[in-house]
Amino acid sequence: MAYQAEYIWIDGTEPTHKLRSKTRVVPDGKKPPVWGFDGSSTNQATGHFSDCVLEPVFTCPDPLRGPNDVLVMCEVLNADLTPHPTNTRAAAVAVAKQYASFEPMFGIEQEYTFFQDGRPYGWPEVGFPAPQGPYYCGVGGTKMPGREIVEAHTLACLRAGLAVEGTNAEVMMGQWEFQVGVLSTVAVGDQLWTARWLLERIAEDFGVDVSFDAKPIKGDWNGAGAHTNFSTKQMRAAGGWDAIIAGCEALGTRVLEHIENYGDGIKDRLTGAHETAPWSKFSYGVSDRGSSVRIPGGVARDKRGYLEDRRPNANVDPYVVARLMVETICGAAASTKPAAKPTAKRAPATKAVAKKATARKAPARR
């Protein structure tokens, strides 16, 4: 019997890419094949040369359909099968291979806001709800609108086999969070984009929209972020504290590059208020949610673990944030590694007399 494959891809909408999808019926026993779409309708091509290619890269069970149906996350390619300019995954794959020896791992805390009829879900038609305070991790029918969608989304992610670690209500009414991880550089993007698609698709059934805007409501209301937890095997190992501090220092050397790629509207969110650091000032500290990068208290006690970059927006591309963090942190660590110790290389012995081996110094890494 044939099955349904829902092909999901990232479009070319600016300044924030959106998700698109369409269904293909695939014969039983066959894998989802390479497919295509009209790029002129997704801001990825012009009308006179509009063919774009969908290359399957991640497949998981479709929790919304039958037991044999699947979700298929795709890379977008040009007609000549080179990565499309909107394809940020390809660059993440290259960086992951380059720094594979560091074994970088990620966990991303995805915040978002439900909207209905142009205002946050559950807000009064006129005016505002009660000030922030009771909503974060709260409970109660009048304070927690959207929980039924959150529960359905969490169950769907689990049935799909996605590495969802948890959910919670956030500081502003109508705002929620789920966490994905711990996953490798590319896998965290594959699974977070898939989880985002499931969230929007499920909210659709409730007549509710999902916003990943960094500051969906102006004023004294929290923005929405995607705090990104990062570690290498050196950080996770006993005595990894020095590697964690080195990672924080490395992030401080490329501040503007990260800020410019951490999502649209970041300057509206990173103001120094509402548990953020000013976008223009880099800082890190233990247990400090007002810093750019937080080192959890438990990590400081254990002297090993991970760091949390609190700057990425909710609308950040996870492939981009993962690539940048690996490039910056692992790249800095690789450039400061000491040269290998010289080793003696023995020359082959002859029948007359064995030649004395001479030490050869290993070249320093550049």
Residue ranges of predicted features:
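Low-complexity, polybasic segments enriched for Lys interleaved with small residues
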Residues: A339, T343-A364
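Glycine-rich, acidic/polar active-site loops that bind/position phosphate-bearing ligands
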Residues: M1-K341, R366
